[in-house]
Every structure is written in structure tokens, then in C-alpha cells.
Amino acid sequence: MISEFVFSAVHLKVDHETQRRSASCIWCSKVCGFILLLVFIVASYVLSSERKTLLFAPYLMEEDLSEDALRDVVRSIATKVKFRARRVPDVSELMGLEEHMFSVVPRRFLPDLKNPCWFEELHGDVSADPYGSNLFGRSFRQIQLIFEQLSGLFRRRLTRRDGKLQRLRCLPYFYIIGQPKCGTTDLYERLRLHPDVRLTPPKEPHWWTRKRFGIVRSGERPHTRFPLDHYLDLFDPVALQIQQSLLGNSSSNITSEASASTMWDNNAWLYLHGNSTGAEPPSLVQDLIHALQPDARFIAILRDPVERSEVTGVLIPNCVCVQVRLQVGLYVVYLLDWMSVFSRDQLLVLRLEDHASNPELSMSRIFRFLRLGALSDQRQRQISKRPASNTRHPSDRDLGPMRPITRELLTLFYAPFNQRLAEVLQDESFTWDGRSEHT
């Protein structure tokens, strides 16, 4: 409508001055009327207390495929699903890809510490701010404030060993690796309450999968890479606490991070190598972590992938044109990759459904897995009774349920992957058909 007004105004040629003014006034009044109407529509939507429908629903073309045809397509995909073992690179290949990383992290960690830590020799001016150039500090205000506090303590925490100034450096003892929208935040916040667990922001640095390649946000092209030293700086608050406890010759404190992309996101290779690496990347995140931390432990919490898709807020009624990350729900594909380098007892896989229904049992399993000390009854109740974190916002629920045909197609699509997951974990509850060994 606006384009019609514009073109009519451009091509309007009237010699008489009065006619020109009249036409101009008419054009302006139409445009103003249109804008006023648009503002009224938007305002009425924004002021609505429900907002249960989209403001502008896309035009739905008459379906060319019947629901039966769609079911047949999904079933045909399921028949082609095959699980093949991947080629695991050897350490020499990894060292060629990440030479600096292997020069920073030693092959052995300090023996009297539960958390993987080591002393790093300092070079250059020790009076300079060691965190001034840290890219995490520039990206997160909260981290910047922490770094400012650490900078004031930096020289005091240096130790002299073999005549050289050194600082204590640490990596996480365990990682919460996924999946998105499956309860990682709730696990993280409950673990924070254990006296032996020391967690620092951010919860999700996404360094292994994204920022070390220069990807700040998912889907963006790479920019400036975040060095390993900047990642290690995030754990300096914990390193300081562990160093203080070393006065007692040992420390049981551990730290972690919970980037929900660690389990599945290897998309950075597309930017770095394109299609030149063949059918799969030359190495995955887990290969590097295993080479550096062969004894690391990992927690993955999963939910019914159909429900996970709905919670992401993209599969909503009247909207069939939004990109969906279906691959995130292919849990077994990623789990098999992790099990190609780490043993089964280093991976704890939970279901969100079980965790939500019985958090006390779920957290007890996690504490045993991490070999954490016993808790008082009061602290145990505090952890298990803590309100759930990062639950679905009420306004998201107003979008309504998933369309029945969408749910059915997703169930068909994920079925062979869920079945294989249940076989790998020897637990039928991971088929998400209502059975569970843990509830």
C-alpha cells in the first residue's frame, strides 16, 4: 500500500499549484492514516495480556503433501539410519593442530589436588595487569569485576619454585556438556551449593566449541580467537582458593563449567575447513579434552527430544517456516563420539524427567559420580529442595501446544536414535515411552 502511494506521488504531474498542494495533502493524509493504523495494531498486540498468537502469521499455502505422505518420508529416513565408528586421531595429529595448547597444559597435574592444576612459570613484567586484555572480561561485565579483584591480589599469590615465579593454573575437574534446554542450569545451580564445588561465572563460556575458534555467538562467522590463557583465567578464583588450601598439603575442592554446546557443537570446522576435511572433522572437542585431561568426568542431562524441540519455542502453531535444530536431539550420535575416547564410567547421563521428579536422588547420583564428600542432612535438603532454575517462562507456554502431526513426525524421526541410545546406556527409559528405571 505504501509503495502505491509513493509511486502515485512520484508520477503525479499537475501544472496547477492548487492541484499539486491538494494531491500532496491527500498523499500525506493517506500515509499518516496507514502509519496510525499500523501503530494501533502493534500497540493493541503489545498491550494484550495474552499474546497467544503471532502478530503476523505467515501465509500457509495449501498443503501439497498429505499427512500420510509426510509419515512415509520420515519412516524412510529412519530406515537409512546407520551408526558407524569414527576414526580417532592420535595425539601427534592433535599436537599438530593445537601446538600452543599442548605447550601450556602439562602432561601431569599436581598429585595432592583432586582438581587438575599445575604451576605455570611467569615471564615478563609481573606488575602488569594479567587480565587487562582478557576477551571474556571485555565481553562480560561480571567477569571484568572479578578480574579487577584478582588483579589486586595477583602478585601476592605468586610463588617461587626452583628460583622462578609461578602461578597456579587449573582446568575443570568435570564438565556439564549438554544438552540445551535439558536442565543444565538447574544442575549447575544445585552443584554450586556443595561445599567442595567451586564455580565461577560464566556458566557457559563455550570456549571449546566456539570461542577458541573466534565464534562469539552461535551461527556467527569467526572473529578474534579467545586464547587458552583467557579460558584458564576464568578458573583463577578457584585456583586461588585451592592454593590457599595447599597450606594443608591437599585440597578436595573442584571446579567445573556447563557449556551446553560442548557435547554436540562441532560446527566451527565448517568455517575453518569447509568441505576440505572429508566426511567428518579431523578432530572433535572430546579428542582434545581427552589428550589433555584423560581422567576428566562429564555429565549430560537429556530430555525427550520431542519435548526439547517444543521448549525451544520454534515449533509453534501456525508457523512452519522457522529453522529448527533437530540435530541437537540426536543424543546417541554425540554420545558415541564421546565414548570413542572416554570410558563409560567417565560419563554420567541423566534424564531431565527423572531429575525433575526426584532431584534428591538425581543429585545423590551426581555426588557419587564426582566422588564428593558426604553432606549434612541440612545441606542435602537445601540442595534437593531448591526451586528449579531456568524453567519455561509463562509467556512461552501461551504459544500453545505443538501441532499433533508435528509431534507425531518428530516422534517417528527420533525413534531409531532413542532406541539406539537406550541400547548404549542399557536403560529403556531413554526411549521416552513412559518407562524408567530411576523414578
Question: What are these model-predicted stretches?
Answer:
Residues I2, H11-S22, I41-K80, I316, ...:
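The conserved 3'-phosphoadenosine-5'-phosphosulfate
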Residues I2-H273, L292, A296, R308, ...:
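PAPS-dependent sulfotransferase catalytic core
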Residues K30-G33, L38, K52, D196-V197, ...:
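PAPS-dependent sulfotransferase catalytic domain
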Residues T159-R160, K164-R169, W264, G313-C321, ...:
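Short glycine/proline-rich turn/loop motifs
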Residues Y175, D186, L288, R297, ...:
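Amphipathic alpha-helical recognition patches that constitute DNA-binding helices
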Residues G219-P222, F226, T277, V322-L326, ...:
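Short, surface-exposed alpha-helical recognition segments that flank or form part
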Residues L228-D236, Q286, L335-L336, N418:
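Generic structural signal for well-ordered alpha-helices
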